Every structure is written in C-alpha cells, then in structure tokens.
Amino acid sequence: MAHRLLRDAQADGWERSDFPIICESCLGDNPYVRMLRAEYDKECKICARPFTVFRWRPGRDARYKKTEICQTCCKLKNVCQVCLLDLEYGLPVQVRDTALAINSNDAIPRSDVNREYFAEEHDRKARAGIDYDSSHGKARPNDTILKLQRTAPYYKRNRAHVCSFYVRGECTRGAECPYRHEMPETGELSQQNIKDRYYGVNDPVALKLLGKAGEMPSLTPPDDESIRTLYIGGLNNRITEQDLRDQFYAHGEIESIRMVLQRACAFVTYTTREGAEKAAEELANKLVIKGIRLKLMWGKPQAPKPEDDEAGRQGHVAHGGMLPRAVISQQQSGDQPQPPGMEGQQQAPSGSYYFNIPAPPGAERTLYPSMDPQRMGALVKSQEGDGKPGPQQAAQAQASSSSGQSYPMPPQYYHGQYPPYYPPYGGYMPPPRMPYPPPPQYPPYQPMLATPAQSQASSSQQPAPATLHQAQVPPPQQTTQN
C-alpha cells in the first residue's frame, strides 16, 4: 500500500460513497438518524483498502455502530457492511451458500495482491455499467432458507456491550454506566471471527442454524380422514383473504376460507383430503406471506360435549347465591307445569340445558342482587309461602295494637348503650333512623269571647255614635276685632 500514497487519490479507485449499504436491523427503528461520514477513515477488514466510514447510533438505548467493510466487498457477497449478514434473508453467508449449493470459497482470492486486483476489476466493471459476476447470483430460495430466514428486524442486536469493569466487580458508575451490567455469555457463540463470517467458514452461528433446520418437525396428518381444514395463525390487517387464496390454491381446490381477525387466525378448508395434505407438507415451517411468517397447523373439529344431569344442574344455578330463594328452588327442582294431555311424558331438553346460552333481551326478567328482599331489610314472608307474617312481625303488631298508637315502639337500650349494629352483607349501609312519636297536636288559635256583663260596661262608657238624622255641628269659632 506504500506505492498508493504517491498517486492521486481520485484516480486510485478507493471507495467514496454518500450512504452505506446496511440492513434494517443495523439502521435501527428511529426514522431520524444522524450519521457521521469520514472519507478514507479506516481500512476494510477484508481487502485492507481505505474506504468511507459511517458512524451512527441506531436507537436511544443502543451503542454507536460503524461500517466494517467496504462496499466492494459488500457487493461481492451481498451482505451488510456492519453485521455481514445477507441483505435479503438476514442469514449468515455459510447458511445461505449451503442452502443454495454455492461454493464461493475459491471465487474470491485471499492473498493481498490477488484480492486487490480482484476488487479493482469489479469496481471498473461497476463504473462502466457492466453487471459483474458476483458469487451469490440471484437464486430462488429453497426450503431451508424459507424456514430460517428472518422476516422482521432484530433490534436487540444493537444493545450496548457488557461492562468489563462490572464483570470484575469494579464498576463505580452504577445506573449511569452506558454499558450493560450483565455477565457475558460463554460457549461457542462467544468466539466469532469477522473473516470466517464473511467467507462462510467455521461460523458457529451458521452451524447452530443449520442444526436447527434439521430438527424442525413436520406436520403429521391426523387419523381422522374427514379433517380437511388447515389452521393459519399470526395474521394481521395486511393479509387479506385473496392473499391466502393465492398461496393455498396451488395445492388443491379450496372449499372455503374463514378469517377470524379478532383471533388473528384463519381456517382454509379444501374439497379433498389430498389437497390439504399436500399443502401441509409443502408449507410446513415455511409459510411466509408479505414478509410475515405464519404458523400452519391442522384444524380440529369442534364437536359439542354433552354434560350429565348433575353437571348441567350445577352450571344452571352457578349464580344461585345471588338470586332470591324462590328462584333458586325453582331452578333446582326443575318442576315446570306441563300442558294438559302431556302428563307423564318426558319432554325434550332445551338448548340452555346443555349450553350456557344467555336469554335474548326481554325474554325473562333479569334478577340482580339488589332486588333480593332478604338483603335490603324489608319484610320477608314466611318460608311456608302462605303470606303470614313472621313471629317478630306478629309481636310488634300485637304491641302496637294494645297501646292504641299507630307509631312503632321507641328504641330500647341495653345497659345504657345502644344495641349493637352489624353492617349488612355485601357492603356498608348507614343504619336507618329510629322513628319517634310525633309532638302533640293542638287546635288552631281562637280569640277568647267576652262575657255579657263586660260587654254592657264597655258600651256604657263609650259615647253613642252619631246617626244619619243628627247633624254634626262644628264648634263655634271665636273672632277678635281690633
């Protein structure tokens, strides 16, 4: 690389770009990202050539990330410049090449001179508009890729690194430490090399994914030959009925498609059992529609299970403690009058006997706990149902009739204290006011009448009034003459 320092940087072929080639997981979930761009800041960890480095923070709780390889090496393998995973499927290079049967180990040279010449040759073809022969090509994804591909971004990969001082027990920052206070993971996945990831050799993550693909179970058809329905789970508003029809129609004729958006699932029913088995075999563990991985299972019949008499009776009076006694006894007995001419015949049980189906509005009167007279302190008829008052009410009626008063008896006192008060069942209720006798009523006020002697004396003392025939003469006026 020493001879390159004497030449013009613009004609050298080094990378100069305005935006990196990265995956959605490394970019982060924040739509507003501030990036730092530095030309020729680092050398590529694959070809050792200077390139433009981009640095940014993908999220609030994430660490700063930067590009690790140049765009030339990135385009040769179709991988991200940061995590070196496939841009289309999100898988390591070794998993992708193994699934697509691509042998790219010998396609890219590893020596310094040959690798530099190989990169410059591809850059020249790219500037000339020639589609250079990349190692990955454009192949159709097979079953292994469809099973293992990542359909949604994985932002957990952008978390901060583990604090090394915390591992040694010497971190004094506490909650202000920008690194994670966790113990590091040990095992095969902790030893990873960037060159092994790029070339697809001895990658522990790829080996784990390939082993997982071989252990995935397949859908076993049920023994019941009448089942022709497949269950699809994990739906959202983006997937429509037409999308499901386009995906499943290639395996057989579809009888019906029922979507249950409240449960985020759907049921696809085929006209034949062979079509359902073929769809379950070809789409098991690899059903992806509009980039969303869906769950595929065999449907189960929903046959009603009849209950015995005792279980049905218990379910029918499950809320018996909240109803009046008359209603409870009527439900428990189940004795309903039969129409004339039907005595002694067994009636068919109604639908509510087997299923707890609520009655339609207005069919019967709704009973609430507040309507129970036994919990409101009201007068309750005797249990015989003859309408006679109880013993306490009869005693109070006899006492009121003997005294001749219509108001109840005054409150009694026990040893100078009020009788103990117990709150009613179901919550607090203020005690009722004790009735007292009303104050005595007096007749309305009338003025006192005078006796005959007093009336004669008063009339003699008062002068007689002038009559109409007597002229009232004014008193004479005295005049003086000068």
UniProtKB/Swiss-Prot annotation:
Disordered as annotated region, ranges: 329-482
Ranges annotated as biased composition (Pro residues): 429-446, 473-482
Domain RRM: 228-301
Keyword terms: DNA-binding, Metal-binding, RNA-binding, Zinc, Zinc-finger
ZnF (C3H1-type) intervals: 157-184
InterPro entries per record: Cwc2/Slt11, Nucleotide-bd_a/b_plait_sf, RBD_domain_sf, RRM_dom, STL11/RBM22-like_N, Torus, Znf_CCCH, Znf_CCCH_sf
Gene Ontology terms, MF aspect: DNA binding; pre-mRNA binding; U6 snRNA binding; zinc ion binding
GO cellular component, one term: U2-type catalytic step 2 spliceosome
Ranges annotated as spanning the membrane: none
SMART domains noted in UniProt: RRM (SM00360), ZnF_C3H1 (SM00356)
Signal sequence, start to end: none
SUPFAM superfamilies the record matches: CCCH zinc finger, RNA-binding domain, RBD
Name of a matching Pfam family: STL11_N
Low complexity: compositionally biased ranges: 329-347, 389-428, 452-466
Protein name as annotated: Zinc finger CCCH domain-containing protein 40
